[in-house]
Swiss-Prot record:
Protein name: o-succinylbenzoate synthase
Naturally occurring in which organism (per UniProt): Escherichia fergusonii (strain ATCC 35469 / DSM 13698 / CCUG 18766 / IAM 14443 / JCM 21226 / LMG 7866 / NBRC 102419 / NCTC 12128 / CDC 0568-73)
Catalytic residues as annotated in Swiss-Prot or TrEMBL: K133, K235
UniProt superkingdom: Bacteria
Pathway: Quinol/quinone metabolism; 1,4-dihydroxy-2-naphthoate biosynthesis; 1,4-dihydroxy-2-naphthoate from chorismate: step 4/7; Quinol/quinone metabolism; menaquinone biosynthesis
Biological function: Converts 2-succinyl-6-hydroxy-2,4-cyclohexadiene-1-carboxylate (SHCHC) to 2-succinylbenzoate (OSB).
Catalysed reaction equations from the record: (1R,6R)-6-hydroxy-2-succinyl-cyclohexa-2,4-diene-1-carboxylate = 2-succinylbenzoate + H2O
GO biological process, any: menaquinone biosynthetic process
Length: 320
């Protein structure tokens, strides 16, 4: 016998979270819980404003329609990426095919003061990997901050993310302030320039390796080995089903590229599932999941070590 519940939720964000020039005051999304016999599975559907093609209202309509079809015996996955991902996670939990082992080691995210990151990294065991958003301020300032961090922590490797913010000139201004001796410790810089061609040129001219992120979701993207391209950053909420995520990881690994499972600012429930996906598909790579502290609460499932207030499922708005 099948049954299902759908919940709507909204979590207040910390002040200062800006996505594509718009302030994100709340994170809005949905959970689906599927039950069959004694088994149950959960999934999160939370389109990311400014990045997802769909709104959460559109996702809600597609999810509710899919759940009704599933209750009637239909199992075909929806096409909408955020819904496909959440539903496929719920089905995988239901079938016990999503491994429980999780990689909760997150590359800490530097959102402001580099001194805060230096302190955080001092206590980090093992490989020191951190992520810095660039492109929000002047490129020269970004270059100086990155150089400072690499100089202060000799065993640090940085992942940088520009979200296509730079023109070729700004990219050159950034690189000018990063000591060439340190550039090898930039693990990769995600999508530095507005076009792929300019990003490739940036990698050739600076010796700084790049990674594809937004490009993976463009219709003309193909997985090929390219000079200067070291990694792909896979955001499952923006990608689609677990099967599609798995295919992208396999395609990257076949070319010798690093595949990084990364957050789209999911709630703690979604983040714990991403940690499990990372341990399963990319066991040797630290995932990019250090986004929970951008929120003011965790929900339904706790993130290990988080001191954020916890909201149980009973406090959520039930739609079905």
């Amino acid at each position: 016998m099948r049954s299902a519940q759908v919940y709507r939720w909204q979590i207040p964000m910390d002040a200062g979270v800006v996505l594509r020039d718009r302030r994100l005051k709340t994170r809005d999304g949905l959970y689906v819980c599927l039950r069959e016999g004694e088994c149950e599975g959960w999934g999160e559907i939370s389109p990311l404003p400014g990045f997802s093609q769909e709104t959460w209202e559109e996702a809600q309509c597609v999810l509710l329609a899919w759940v009704n079809n599933w209750l009637a015996g239909d199992c075909e996955l929806p096409q909408m990426p955020s819904v496909a991902f959440g539903v496929s996670c719920a089905l995988a939990e239901l079938a016990d095919t999503l491994p429980q082992a999780a990689n909760f080691r997150a590359a800490p995210l530097c959102n402001g003061d580099p001194d805060d990151l230096i302190l955080k990294l001092a206590d980090m065991p093992g490989e020191k990997v951190a992520k810095v958003k660039v492109g929000l301020y002047e490129a020269v300032r970004d270059g100086m901050v990155v150089n400072l961090l690499l100089e202060a922590i000799p065993d640090l490797h940085l992942r940088l993310d520009a979200n296509r913010a730079w023109t070729p000139l700004k990219g050159q201004q950034f690189a000018k302030y990063v000591n060439p001796d340190y550039r090898g410790r930039i693990a990769f810089l995600e999508e530095p320039c507005k076009t792929r061609e300019d990003s490739r040129a940036f990698a050739r001219e600076t010796g700084i390796a790049i990674a594809w992120d937004e490009s993976l979701r463009e219709p003309d993207f193909a997985f090929v080995a390219e000079e200067g391209v070291r990694a792909v950053v896979i955001k499952p909420t923006l990608t689609g089903s677990l099967e599609k995520v798995h295919e992208q990881v396999q395609a990257a690994h076949a070319l010798g590229l690093t595949a990084v499972i990364s957050s789209s600012i999911e709630s703690s429930l979604g983040l714990t599932q991403l940690a499990r996906i990372a341990a399963w598909l990319t066991p040797d790579t630290i995932p990019g999941l250090d986004t929970l502290d951008l929120m003011q609460a965790q929900q339904v499932r706790r993130w290990p070590g988080s001191t954020l207030p916890f909201v149980d499922v009973d406090a959520l708005e039930r739609l079905l």
